[in-house]
Amino acid sequence: VDFAGSDTAHRPMAGRVTSAKIVIAGGFGVGKTTLVGSVSEITPLTTEAIMASAGVGVDDTRQVPGKTTTTVAMDFGRITIDRDLILYLFGTPGQTRFWFMWDELVRGAIGAVVLVDTRRLADCFAAIDFFEHRRLPYLVAINCFDGMQYHNAQDVRDALAISSEVPVVSCDARNRESTKHVLISLVEYVLSMRRSRAVAPA
C-alpha cells in the first residue's frame, strides 16, 4: 500500500520501503507517552512539561495519582514493522486546552489508536468524535493498568457506542510486543477498509 494516498490494496514490492503516520490519542494520563516510548526503536521525542498551576481545576488528576508531567505538544517515535514498512507515531496531548494542535497532528495520518482507561471511559469520547468526524480509521486499545482489564472488549464497545467494525483490543502500554500488536492491528484494519472500498461498486 502506498499510504501516501494511493488506493492500491497490496503491500509494497520487495525492496520498496513504505512509511506511514499513526496518531496515538486518548484522555489525560491514559498512557500515550508510555505507549510511544515502549515501542519506539529510536529515543522518542517527548514534549512533557511539569504540570503547573494553570492546570489546577482543569486537569483531573484524581485517577492518575503521582502524575507530575503532561504532554504539551506531542510525542514522536518510530517503529519498523517489517523490512518494508516503517510507522511514525505521533502522540497527542491529552489535555483539552491543547486540542487545537490535533488538526495538524492528524494531517497525513493513515489511522489512529484511541487508548482508553476503562475506569475513565468518558475521557476518550472527544478523541473518538474527532476521528469519526474526519473519517479517519481508528481502533480502541484498552490499556490494562497493572495487568488488569476492568471490562471486556464488548462491554467497552457498547459503552462507547462505536461501530462493530471498529477493532477493540487490549494492551499493556508498557510492553513493546503488546503495543506492536496494537499497531499491526490498526494497519491491518486500514488495509481491510481500503480493500473494501476498492471492490465496492461505483
Give the residues covered by each predicted segment:
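Conserved nucleotide-binding/hydrolysis micro-motifs of P-loop NTPases
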Residues: 29, 95, 119-122, 145-149, ...
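Switch II of P-loop NTPase G domains
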Residues: 68-78, 82-130
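Conserved G1/Walker A P-loop phosphate-binding module
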Residues: 2-64, 78-82, 86-88
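Canonical P-loop GTPase G-domain recognition
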Residues: 146-202
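A short hydrophobic beta-strand->loop->alpha-helix junction that borders the nucleotide-binding pocket
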Residues: 25, 92-93, 172-173
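Conserved C-terminal guanine-recognition region of P-loop GTPase G domains, centered on the G4
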Residues: 115-165
